[in-house]
């Protein structure tokens, strides 16, 4: 695997060569589903790059966003591949009540509509 914190942006593109994207286990995500999701995000962002659109960066509160954040922001000197897990998600400020869950769904709906 490559040292993603050193070489990749959060949209899975190379830091010094825009338009070149990486995906899968070589980026430091581990697992079939994680590799597939990184390929989907990288492919989506490559199409957006070719169409001169801004990249899609998934919110860090989602597993897709948390994995992309982890592989691009962790310590370069100790970078190790990571599977999807609750440990890479940011802490919630409070216990999630029904109203907050509703707000979370609204935020995700808004994000999806912005794609």
Language-model segments: which ranges?
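Extended hydrophobic-aromatic, low-complexity segments
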Residues: 30-35, 55
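An active-site-proximal "capping" alpha-helix that borders the catalytic cofactor pocket
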Residues: 35-49
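FAD-binding beta-loop-beta segment adjacent to the flavin cofactor pocket
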Residues: 1-29, 72-87
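C-terminal auxiliary extensions adjacent to catalytic cores
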Residues: 79-115
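Active-site-proximal substrate-binding core of FAD-dependent oxidoreductases
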Residues: 13-16, 47-82
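Generic recognition of stable, solvent-exposed alpha-helical segments in well-folded globular domains
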Residues: 3, 21, 34-38, 62, ...
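Short acidic (Asp/Glu) and glycine-rich catalytic loops that position anionic groups and cofactors
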Residues: 18-22, 47-50, 89-92
